[in-house]
Curated annotation (Swiss-Prot):
Forms part of the preprotein translocase complex of the outer mitochondrial membrane (TOM complex) which consists of at least 7 different proteins (TOMM5, TOMM6, TOMM7, TOMM20, TOMM22, TOMM40 and TOMM70). Interacts with mitochondrial targeting sequences. Interacts with TIMM29; linking the TIM22 complex to the TOM complex. Forms a complex with BCAP31 (via C-terminus) which mediates the translocation of components of the mitochondrial membrane respiratory chain NADH dehydrogenase (Complex I) from the cytosol to the mitochondria. One of its GO terms (molecular function) is porin activity. Keywords: Ion transport, Membrane, Mitochondrion, Mitochondrion outer membrane, Porin, Protein transport, Transmembrane, Transmembrane beta strand, Transport. Belongs to the Tom40 family. InterPro entries: Porin_dom_sf (IPR023614), Porin_Euk/Tom40 (IPR027246), Tom40 (IPR037930). This is Mitochondrial import receptor subunit TOM40 homolog. The lineage of its organism: Eukaryota, Metazoa, Chordata, Craniata, Vertebrata. It comes from Rattus norvegicus (Rat). Residues 1-72 are annotated as: Disordered. Channel-forming protein essential for import of protein precursors into mitochondria. Plays a role in the assembly of the mitochondrial membrane respiratory chain NADH dehydrogenase (Complex I) by forming a complex with BCAP31 and mediating the translocation of Complex I components from the cytosol to the mitochondria.
Amino acid sequence: MGNVLAASSPPAGPPPPPTPSLVGLPPPPPSPPGFTLPPLGGGLGTGSNAGRGSERTPGAAASGAAASSNDGNCGCLPNPGTFEECHRKCKELFPVQMEGVKLTVNKGLSNRFQVTHTVALGTIGESNYHFGVTYVGTKQLSPTEAFPVLVGDMDNSGSLNAQVIHQLSPGLRSKMAIQTQQSKFVNWQVDGEYRGSDFTAAVTLGNPDVLVGSGILVAHYLQSITPCLALGGELVYHRRPGEKGTVMSLAGKYTLNNWLATVTLGQAGMHATYYHKASDQLQVGVEFEASTRMQDTSASFGYQLDLPKANFLFKGSVNSNWIVGATLEKKLPPLPLTLSLCAFLNHRKNKFLCGFGLTIG
């Protein structure tokens, strides 16, 4: 979707340096103490689900399973979540590549306001500095969720990523995001999401330009068919001078207490994931992707080992391209420090990348 969004912008001089797509902006800095930042993909937290059914997720506790059973007895179906979150549970198990040295300092100025300083030094990519701000509003929906949420991130070159998320009503959530590259305005989008008791519908409008006649419109819909099965689709319409097109995808998600299987099939290809919670400490995932445009397929296996008593989190992965990766996070109590180590090895290209990170606060 991010490639389509970039393609919808009219050409204007040389392209700016590569930047993340607007739909997938870099993750915001951690939320202030005592609050949980809502998913930027539009998913609603448990605090805003009161009276509208609860989302079915694998690995739920016994009380959650009992609640789901009660919903079935009274004829109610659970909310299926959002279309963008279909593959998220599996993809979160895979390690994220980090190269060089990264230092992050989180400073909570109050219960609602936090700033973040990040310095990254790399041997391959450019070294940079990021300043992030997170503000959580006073509209309290639950002990861990409040609105509006304002998130901003600016680097040393002046490039800005900013998002505003607000809960307009118990079922309606909106988001606005902008992205600049130095002094140039790159992307902006507006999202609206409505979550009912057994369905979720969302619309995204990106980079609309009435004068040039360009823009992109994305519509998502996901419906619970049974307590375990949800079906839905995505429709993407993009237009710019001399070009327009529509891309459609269908999705299916099957959820049980400790595993989740999801498949997305469309004109661009196929994407399938399987997530399994083996225990409270071990989670595994398998991902398969096939692209009709690139004429390429890939398969990946990832796992996450979490030992809370040891303050230890490990993620590992291997894929069909013979790329092996791993990350390790170790908290160092009583100090507010988190140590991160990362290593990736590409056997085919004989390349090795490693990274070291330290988070304070």
